[in-house]
From Swiss-Prot:
It comes from Alcanivorax borkumensis (strain ATCC 700651 / DSM 11573 / NCIMB 13689 / SK2). Belongs to the UPF0758 family. Zn(2+) binds at H173, H175, D186. Keywords: Hydrolase, Metal-binding, Metalloprotease, Protease, Zinc. It holds the Pfam family RadC. CDD domains: MPN_DUF2466. InterPro entries: MPN, RadC_JAB, UPF0758, UPF0758_CS, UPF0758_N. Signal peptide: none annotated. This is UPF0758 protein ABO_0214. The lineage of its organism: Bacteria, Pseudomonadati, Pseudomonadota, Gammaproteobacteria, Oceanospirillales. A motif (JAMM motif) lies at residues 173-186. It comes from the Bacteria.
Length: 224
């Protein structure tokens, strides 16, 4: 049975407009993107297959464009639409914090940094540069690859902080494994940067480790 033959209040698009996006399942939301199904499959059926094939919604949305292309029914046009929507979501999450609002608690910083770093297939070390009222001056991704004490250069972080005339910074990096628990190396990096930035009177407010399910604040654990 085609979706057009379903009761109107069960069709994904009409259901979304009448009851809000929160009322739809993952497959129903994805079906709105797909618009049509395949031979013998409605858009909702096809969406379910894609979700099962990729291991769930989060795993699907974290796929690289190349791997996403192998999902059933995911052609170039659909892939482009989905990737564009994901980027719009990331920018929406980041934009409110780019207007000079104070980043005075881990939740505000965590929202911005999660939007930028979660789900990347490699480690990225980034920094929020703040003014003396803890308002955002700039966000920069400084290093990528295997992030350990040998791969993060305090001199470069200090240089960028001084170029931005920053009074404080919030450090962050992601764990591609999805597990946000800080490692011994994470603690070592934090200590080195606190010491180096302290020499130029730049405060390290926090170091956030970003995972799939959220983030861990080293400051909240007394490590900053």
């Amino acid at each position: 049975m085609a979706i057009t033959d379903w009761p109107e209040d069960e069709r994904p698009r009409e259901k979304l407009l009448a009851r809000g996006a929160q009322a739809l399942s993952d497959a129903e939301l994805l079906a709105i993107f797909l618009r049509t199904g395949q031979q013998g499959l409605t858009a909702v059926d096809l969406a379910r297959r894609q979700l099962v094939s990729s291991g769930g919604l989060r795993a699907m949305l974290d796929l690289s464009p190349e791997r996403m292309a192998h999902l059933p029914g995911m052609g170039v046009a659909r892939r482009a639409l989905l990737l564009a929507a994901l980027e719009l979501g990331r920018r929406y999450l980041a934009e409110p914090l780019e207007r000079g609002l104070p980043l005075d608690n881990p939740d505000k910083a965590g929202q911005l940094l999660t939007a930028q770093l979660r789900g990347l297939p490699f480690e990225v070390f980034a920094c929020l540069f703040l003014d003396n009222k803890h308002r955002l001056i700039a966000f920069e991704k400084l290093f990528q690859g295997t992030i350990d004490a040998a791969a993060v250069y305090p001199r470069e972080v200090v240089r960028r902080a001084m170029e931005h005339n920053a009074a404080a910074v919030i450090l962050a990096h992601n764990h591609p494994s999805g597990v946000a628990e800080p490692s011994q190396s994470d603690h070592a990096i934090t200590r080195r940067l606190v010491e180096a930035l302290g020499l130029v009177e730049v405060r390290v407010l926090d170091h956030l480790v970003i995972g799939d399910g959220g983030w861990v604040s080293l400051a909240s654990r007394g490590a900053v």
